Regions:
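Short acidic N-proximal helix/loop "leader" segments that mark the beginning
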Residues: 1-2
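Residue-level recognition of the GNAT/N-acetyltransferase active site
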Residues: 76, 80, 109-111
């Protein structure tokens, strides 16, 4: 049985599940309030990936003057190696292009080899 994935804009109702993923992965996690504030800002793009109705991953980007700053990207350990991160990035770029973003940038730890491989594969 394969899962059905849906990429959609993050809502405030999603922020609790997103915060749980964030806390399980990062040493300095964003709070639920930080995600709620970010997804309310019209200049931002915050997306989630649902796997059969469960939040499996998320990404976020701030947009300013044609630049997209990718601020967050995480996939729950239970859903890794399924292509979710790439789907999220591609969807985020589409939303960014709709907001006239012409260049994207991000930061990643040198030790995060899977993320580096994904970003390089996508041309970052």
């Amino acid at each position: 049985m394969s899962l059905k994935y849906v990429i959609r804009p993050m809502t405030e109702d999603d922020t609790f599940a997103v915060e749980l993923i964030e806390q399980g992965i990062f040493s300095l996690p964003w709070s639920q309030k930080s995600f709620a504030d970010a997804c309310r800002n019209q200049g931002n793009v915050y997306l989630v990936c649902e796997a059969d109705g469960v939040i499996a991953g998320y990404c976020g980007m701030w947009t300013v003057l044609g630049e997209g700053n990718i601020t967050n990207m995480a996939v729950s350990p239970d859903y890794r190696r399924c292509g979710i991160a790439q789907m999220l990035m591609q969807s985020m770029e589409k939303y960014g292009n709709d907001k006239n973003v012409t260049s994207y940038f991000l930061e990643v730890r040198q030790s995060n080899l899977p993320a580096i491989a994904l970003y390089e594969k996508m041309g970052y």
